[in-house]
């Protein structure tokens, strides 16, 4: 087994990735062929296991190979499928502005999730006939809430009991339960005003919207401390403690939406606001949409003790919106340690993809671009030299079949630079160069 490694400009894991990709597409490795194990491959190529694992994860993310538990990596039938692709479908339909490279849509890389494993847990849940004959508990299945307590305490320093947890199909449905519980608090402020789905719920309940935190005495403050805006932003421990102190002094309730807290590339996740308060004065919200799949509509809310009694009086008014079968499946999935391993795998895949996207951007655009990999989420932030506003550039790229997200602010425009954001999950690594070439044409 040999491989060309003299191109030092390309990271070693990408050289391994390209080597195997070409072998697969050329027919040198047939569908069903087992690749060397990470240990054996690293010895054969005289590379580290981390290098081999990164290459294999990228190959899996692009569909060239598939991981079979306790067996290894196997070549898929992607080469055969590519032979039958209708080339005309791959061309950009300019009239309809068909998007060929979508760097905007927030999704999960298909190879970061073990579908076969998840199907096994769902099948097990669906075999529990007696449990499925009854409606689910309005608050969520008890064993699911027990598991959540342990998981949140260990991973996010959340302090709670199963009685404090309410399960629902999405954060929006949980906010509809929460708003009547805090009806005496008539004012709300969002750190990130772009969260329209959340704002819509409070608007439905007649809340007054405030633009500043110092306007919400005895009100509600909604914040995502692990990703404060779409463009990232992480609250420091000091900022968290300052917010808690201010909430105590001015008697406002904090709603902590812990979105993307598990996906920290370069540092450990900060402890939750809820945990820092000792479990009081904070409503904690979490979801499995990024940790598992967006289609698994499973979110949860941890009520502070002072709101639990209020909820218990109204609990009979609500039906459970989340799937009972999925709650049963996730419960065992977490117990068996698969959620933690799923998060680790997802981090590795998306960091590898983001790193490669940033490299391609610098290679193609050179001095016209500066890149930064987002600390939270799956994004690459790009500062560009161009005569256009960010929103204008987004329109120009869309006409060429390339979707990018423009930064709404223009603070860098004085020095001829704008910012855009690229989500790396939805575009295949092999398409990065073509996509960035299109971006270059639009500058």
Question: For the regions a protein language model found, what residue spans apply to each?
Answer:
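PLP-dependent aminotransferase class I/II
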Residues: 282-363, 370-372
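N-terminal basic, amphipathic alpha-helical segments
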Residues: 1-123, 130-133, 312, 316-323, ...
